[in-house]
């Protein structure tokens, strides 16, 4: 699991924890746990055509492509290159609650924490 840019907050706001995963079992467990825990998550796509954005002119790989487009997707694609032999999840966490809400005080917050722990519990005990 990785967290990185926070770039997805522009698309989904502070209430949803955006994530990427290529593991169908984890996705199923996470979506179920998120609903049960009232800890919402939103799956974003690995859009493979954006691989070209992280191909640099000089180095082997570019973790911060110019232009500012698709920052959360390019970050997920970048990290995926390092875990090609393993199931993978990347959460693009914002981690800040701008206003108080039930079970979410204003300020720093562990986005998707309850959902992830419940999903892992389900995966590890089944």
Question: How would you name each of these model-derived features?
Answer:
Residues 1-126:
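A generic structural signal for tightly packed, nonpolar segments enriched in small/aliphatic residues
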